[in-house]
């Protein structure tokens, strides 16, 4: 079954960009992604630009409204995702607990609906 890991953290949480700690964490991300791939469970994963690069679209009264930034102010921002294919929720949760920023952020795990199954 496929599961989406939605990776959240507070803006500014974690190591400072460019620091030795940041470089070390990036190596953890690369190793984690490689481990998912080597285990044959990685479908896809990407980092996202920050909320300052986001645009929200709402359609109201037949017209599209575009707003810079996310729809609502949030304490934690979505920073990326992984899509994995594993047998059980327990397997997904075990992999999610290993996401490098799980120690200062949060990982939301959601099963993906498979409409091809009828």
Question: How should each PLM-predicted stretch be described?
Answer:
Residues 1-118:
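Conserved, structured core segments of small domains
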């Amino acid at each position: 079954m496929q599961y989406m890991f939605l990776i959240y953290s507070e803006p500014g949480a974690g190591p400072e960009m460019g620091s030795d700690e940041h470089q070390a964490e990036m190596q953890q991300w690369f190793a984690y992604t490689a481990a998912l791939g080597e285990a044959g469970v990685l479908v896809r994963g990407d980092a996202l630009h920050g909320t300052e690069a986001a645009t929200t679209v709402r359609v109201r009264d037949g017209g599209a409204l575009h707003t810079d930034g996310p729809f609502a102010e949030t304490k934690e921002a979505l920073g990326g995702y992984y899509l994995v294919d594993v047998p059980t929720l327990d397997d997904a949760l075990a992999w999610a607990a290993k996401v490098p920023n799980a120690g200062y952020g949060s990982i939301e795990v959601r099963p993906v609906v498979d409409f091809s199954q009828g």
